[in-house]
Amino acid sequence: MTKLSLLPLLTLASAVLAKQDAFQAKCASFGRKIKLPNVHVNFVEYVPGGTNLTLPDNDVTCGASSQVVSADMCRVAMAVDTSKSSQITLEAWFPREYTGRFLSTGNGGLSGCIQYYDLAYTAGLGFATVGANNGHNGTSGKPFYQHPEVIEDFAYRSIHTGVVVGKQLTKMFYKEGFDKSYYLGCSTGGRQGFKSIQKYPNDFDGVVAGAPAFNFVNLISWSIHFYSITGSNTSDTYLSPESWKVVHDEIVRQCDEIDGAKDGIIEDTDLCQPVIETIICKPGASDKTNCITGAQAKTVRNVLSPFYGVNGNLLYPRMQPGSELFASSVVYNGQPFRYSTDWYRYVVYNNPDWDATKWTVEDAAVALAQNPYNIQTWDADISSFQKAGGKVLTYHGMQDQLISSDNSKLYYARVAEEMGLGPEELDDFYRFFPVSGMAHCTGGDGAYGIGNGLRTYNGAEPENNVLMAMVQWVEKGIAPEFIRGAKFSNGVGSSVEYTRKHCRYPRRNVYKGPGNYSDENAWECV
C-alpha cells in the first residue's frame, strides 16, 4: 500500500525534474543557435532561483557586484555592434516560468550600467527580459568624449537595439514567442521609455516610465544652475543640510494641511507657494539654529523658481517644494552637479578641462542648440503610439530631488495642446500619476511602494503594482484609476504603516475622513 500511495508523487516529481532538465538542456545548447547579425555571444548559463549571481564584469561605479535571482532562468550575455566604432553590452534573461511577455528595462543617470535588479525583478515576474549598458561602461560621461556614436547609443539606439535583438531571441528560445511587449524604466529609463514612444511607436504595447528625464538638455542645465544660486559651501548664499531642514519644516508647516490632513505629506505641490520670509532670523538673534539669513532666503526663493533662458523663455519648471532634505546633498551641496559637469565637458564643449563653476545661462543656450540625436525627448505629438494601440503609464514622485515632477506635468500639458486632447481622451492611452511622498524613483516620506522595482515592491497584484497594472490595462482593457502606494516602516520588506491611492492627473488627493489619514478610503480624488 505504501508503494502504491507514493507512485503519483514519484510520477509528479519525475515530470517536474524532466521539465527542469529539459529547460536546462535548452539553455545549455541555446548559445550555438544564436546567429544574428552584429551579435556576439559571450556566454549562456542556467541560473537556478535563489542564486546570488556574481557580476565580476560590472563596472565598479555601477555599485552592484552581485544580484540575487529569485527564479530559474537562462542568462544570455552578449555584445551587439551598433556601428563600426560602437557596441552595447546586452543581457537577456529567460525565466522557466514564462508568461508570454517580453520586456525591456532601462538605465539611470548618464550611466552605462545594466540594471541587474530590474532584470531580476521582471524575470521573477515571468517576463523574458533584456537590459543593456547604454553603449558604455560606468556612471561617468567620459566615454562620450569625441565619440558621437556612443552619444547616439545613449540617446536612443541602445534601447531600440536591445529590443530588436531581444525579441528575436525570445522567439528563438520559446516556441510560443511572445504575446505582448513591455517597458519598465525610471529617470533616464523614463526618458528612454518616452523616446521609444516618440521614435519607435511599435516597439512596446505598454510603457511604464517613471520620473522621466525628458527635456533632457534643459534638465542638465537646470541641475547645474543650482550651483550659481547656492554658491560654494563658503558662500553666504549657501545653506547647510541643517538649514535646509529648517526650510523644509517650514514648507511642510505651511503646505501640509492644504489637502485636509496633517500627515507630513504634501499631496499637491501645485498648491504649495511657501513664504520663506517667515523664517528669516530676527535682528540681533543669538540663536540662529531655527532661522536663516536674508541671503539664504533669496537662495530658497530662487531654487523654488522656474529656470528661464537668455531670452526669457522657460527652459525648465521649478523644483517642487517638499524635496529639500533629499536635494540638499545632491544639487544644493555647494558643488556643480556631476552629471551636468560631465555632459558639458564631454558632449557640449569636448573639453575635459571645462570649469563647471563658471557656468552661465548662455551655456544653456549652447547646449540646447546642440541637442545631439534629439536627446531632448520632448516631442509632444505621440499620435503614432496612440494609433499603434500603445499604452503609457507614467508616475513621478513629488519629493523628487533630481528631476522636478513639475516637468512631467509640463509635458502632459504639451501633449494635450499638441494633440488637441483633454484628460478624458488622453486617459485612453496616456495616464500620469503624481506620487506624493516619493523621492527619485524610490524612497521618500510617504507611500512610495508602487511596485516599479524591487525597492518598492508590495505584491504583484495589479492594484499594488504599477507594472502589473500596465499588464492588466494592455491585456484586459482595465485601465488603472489609481496606483496604490505603500508606506513602509523601514524600507521594502518591513511592515506597511499605511497605503494610499495616488490619483491620476489632473485629479488630486483630498482628505475627507472620517477615518485617520492612514486609511486610504478617507481620501478622495477630486
Swiss-Prot record:
InterPro entries: AB_hydrolase_fold (IPR029058), Tannase/feruloyl_esterase (IPR011118). It catalyses: feruloyl-polysaccharide + H2O = ferulate + polysaccharide. Residues 1-18 form the signal peptide. It comes from the Eukaryota. Disulfide bonds join 27-74, 62-113, 186-441, 255-272, 281-291, 503-525. Glycans are attached at residues 52, 137, 233, 516. Ca(2+) binds at residues 256, 259, 261, 263, 265. One of its GO terms (cellular component) is extracellular region. SUPFAM superfamilies: alpha/beta-Hydrolases. The keyword Transmembrane does not apply. Transmembrane segments: none annotated. Keywords: Calcium, Carbohydrate metabolism, Disulfide bond, Glycoprotein, Hydrolase, Metal-binding, Polysaccharide degradation, Secreted, Serine esterase, Signal, Xylan degradation. Belongs to the tannase family. This is Probable feruloyl esterase B-2. It comes from Aspergillus fumigatus (strain ATCC MYA-4609 / CBS 101355 / FGSC A1100 / Af293). The gene is faeB-2.
